[in-house]
Curated annotation (Swiss-Prot):
EC code(s) of this entry: 2.1.1.206
Organism name: Halobacterium salinarum (strain ATCC 700922 / JCM 11081 / NRC-1) (Halobacterium halobium)
Name the UniProt record assigns to this protein: tRNA (cytidine(56)-2'-O)-methyltransferase
BP GO terms, sorted: tRNA nucleoside ribose methylation
Entry keywords, A to Z: Cytoplasm, Methyltransferase, S-adenosyl-L-methionine, Transferase, tRNA processing
Subunit structure, interactors included: Homodimer.
Top enzyme category: transferase
The keyword Methyltransferase appears for this protein: yes
Length: 192
């Protein structure tokens, strides 16, 4: 959320074919819930393209990068590193400390995609568990970002959007930005 030091999300590992949807959702969740950028492994080409496309259509700012240097990204990070793992300290025990640190330092959130090596646990400033139960890494990322931003990410605006969702009790209403608020809603299924 551009008003604080940077928050970046690093997807650590990607198995093409098996992880495509989950890796894409890590990027979409990072964008929607306030991170400034996502870094994907170099082999996550389709996920990177999809998240860039969504950012182009629904606005940013949000950057998408690919890297072959996952470990170097962690080691060279200029701020603090938070590794999300079900084995870590309970989120509710450390979220205040992480939030306070984020006022001064950028945060790199590491989200595993396959077995994460012990080096990542050692390099992290915090290994954080959201419930310490097995569940989706996307759910863990969403809860963590909401705690980090204290819910402010839910009110953020998006710049340079081509399309915008109009919240409604029932149905789907997506407008082209140049048409303004009076544009006809998108057909069912559009904008998914």
């Amino acid at each position: 959320m551009q008003s604080h030091p940077e928050v970046a999300v690093l997807r650590y590992g990607h198995r093409p074919g098996r992880d495509d949807r989950m890796t894409t959702h890590v990027g979409l969740t990072a964008r929607a819930l306030g991170a400034d950028r996502v870094l994907f492994p170099d082999n996550a080409t389709q996920a990177a393209e999809t998240v860039r496309d969504i950012t182009g259509r629904f606005g940013g700012p949000f950057d998408v990068e690919r890297t072959t240097e996952l470990n170097a990204t962690i080691e060279d990070w200029p701020g603090v590193v938070v590794h999300l793992t079900m084995y870590g300290e309970q989120l509710q025990s450390v979220d205040d400390e992480i939030r306070t640190t984020h006022r001064e330092e950028p945060v790199l959130v590491v989200v595993g995609g396959e077995k994460v090596p012990g080096d990542v646990y050692e390099a992290a400033d915090w290994n954080v568990g959201v419930t310490n139960q097995p569940h989706s890494e996307v759910a863990g990322l969403a809860v963590f970002l909401d705690r980090l931003f204290d819910g402010r990410e839910l009110e953020q605006g998006y710049e340079n959007a081509e399309r915008r969702v109009i919240p409604e009790e029932l149905g789907k209403h997506v407008v082209d930005v140049e048409d303004g608020d009076h544009a006809e809603g998108a057909a069912a299924g559009d904008g998914d």
